[in-house]
Amino acid sequence: MKDLAKNKKALHDFSILETFEAGVVLKGSEVKALRAGRANLKDSFVRIIKGEIFLLNAHISHLDTTNSHFRPDERAPRKLLMHRKQIDKLFGSVTKDGLTMVALALYLNDKNIIKARVALAKGKNLHDKRETLKKREADMEARAAMKKFI
């Protein structure tokens, strides 16, 4: 699996509870742009609208080498493909538990098909973010000490 775009900010702002794989409906020029690494998921999020799941606010830049007559919107909502039971489960978690859905990555699977890694997440507050940073620093110091010792 080759990651084409990652949402590193989501890992910082949310605690991930469960991840799902979803197909993405794209135009041909968007696929070429994704393979060229011209995507950004920084402020993107996932919503369920009328029983369908959409990736919103994901930025896929236009590639200059593709057809110039048709230029898709760079921040257009992109439909995600999931099984009905998965969508219903996500909808229940979002409405009852107050969780959010976030796009973590766009990647190529083993069959060279572009997929989205969608996560069910809970927002972190400032205290949680600081705690995560402290744990990360402590782990780095422990690794450095182990390296010196060995």
UniProtKB/Swiss-Prot annotation:
Entries under CDD domains matching the protein: SmpB (cd09294)
Cited InterPro entries: SmpB, SsrA-bd_prot, SsrA-bd_prot_CS
Key words of the record: Cytoplasm, RNA-binding
Biological processes annotated in GO: trans-translation
Chief localisation class: cytoplasm
Localisation per UniProt entry: Cytoplasm
Single GO cellular component term: cytosol
GO molecular function: RNA binding
Cystine crosslinks: none
PANTHER family documented for this protein: SSRA-BINDING PROTEIN (PTHR30308:SF2), TMRNA-BINDING COMPONENT OF TRANS-TRANSLATION TAGGING COMPLEX (PTHR30308)
HAMAP family: SmpB
Purpose of the protein: Required for rescue of stalled ribosomes mediated by trans-translation. Binds to transfer-messenger RNA (tmRNA), required for stable association of tmRNA with ribosomes. tmRNA and SmpB together mimic tRNA shape, replacing the anticodon stem-loop with SmpB. tmRNA is encoded by the ssrA gene; the 2 termini fold to resemble tRNA(Ala) and it encodes a 'tag peptide', a short internal open reading frame. During trans-translation Ala-aminoacylated tmRNA acts like a tRNA, entering the A-site of stalled ribosomes, displacing the stalled mRNA.
Family: Belongs to the SmpB family.
Protein name as annotated: SsrA-binding protein
Organism of this sequence: Campylobacter curvus (strain 525.92)
